[in-house]
């Protein structure tokens, strides 16, 4: 099983870049991140680190690509550190993660609800959404071409933000950034409260 797993991963990353799939070109923040914590960080750490950094910008100071996918990178980065005990990786990952969270708090945070806007984790195509988010007369498959998608607040995406706040606190603790640990924990708690308040159906218990 180990041989098959590593062989499959190496086949999917012939140029050291872990792809979303065999026929996909280029890199994608969400897919790289999920592949990293599913197995790649443990099985092929050198290619995983390369792939994770490939989706950052500004000299590894920010996470790039679609804004609603960016913060999932935080989970993959901390998982990589846990599996490889690479403190140098974590130091730079913390910078990119903290900077990106600060940017998204300014650009994608709905203060009225205390939730982040943007499509859900897996639905990057409009086919995953119903009306009125999906506009029947709009033939584009790209989700942001449908104006209603820009202000939605999805459960999966906001759960990722909650976990990212928790992991930013963990990163701060490991790296000795004591002044920010409490702030990230408080933000995680607030995020959890708002998810339960606005995205949890008590009657359906879901």
Task: Give short role names for the model-derived ranges.
Residues 1-5, 44-57, 87-105, 160, ...:
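Extended, well-ordered alpha-helical scaffold segments
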Residues 33-57, 127-148, 183, 190:
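Solvent-exposed, charged interface segments at domain starts and junctions
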Residues 62-68, 105-186, 202:
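The feature captures the catalytic groove of carbohydrate-active enzymes
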Residues 1-92, 98:
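Substrate-binding groove/exosite segments of carbohydrate-active enzymes
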Residues 200-206:
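Carbohydrate-active enzyme catalytic cores, enriched for enzymes
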Residues 22, 32, 93, 120, ...:
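Solvent-exposed, flexible loop/coil residues
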């Amino acid at each position: 099983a180990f041989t098959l797993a590593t062989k499959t991963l190496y086949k999917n990353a012939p140029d050291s870049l872990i792809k979303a799939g065999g026929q996909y070109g280029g890199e994608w923040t969400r897919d790289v991140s999920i592949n990293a914590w599913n197995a790649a960080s443990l099985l092929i750490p050198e290619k995983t680190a390369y792939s994770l950094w490939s989706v950052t910008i500004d000299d590894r100071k920010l996470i790039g690509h679609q804004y609603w996918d960016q913060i999932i990178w935080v989970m993959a980065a901390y998982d990589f550190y846990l599996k490889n005990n690479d403190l140098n990786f974590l130091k730079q990952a913390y910078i990119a993660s903290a900077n990106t969270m600060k940017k998204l708090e300014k650009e994608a945070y709905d203060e009225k609800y205390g939730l982040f806007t943007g499509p859900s984790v897996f639905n990057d195509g409009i086919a995953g959404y119903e009306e009125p988010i999906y506009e029947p007369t709009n033939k584009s498959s790209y989700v942001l071409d449908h104006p209603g998608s820009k202000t939605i607040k999805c459960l999966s995406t906001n759960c990722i933000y909650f976990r990212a706040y928790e992991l930013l606190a963990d990163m701060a603790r490991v790296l000795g950034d004591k002044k920010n640990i409490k702030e990230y924990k408080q933000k995680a708690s607030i995020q959890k409260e708002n998810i339960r308040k606005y995205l949890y159906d008590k009657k359906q218990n879901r």
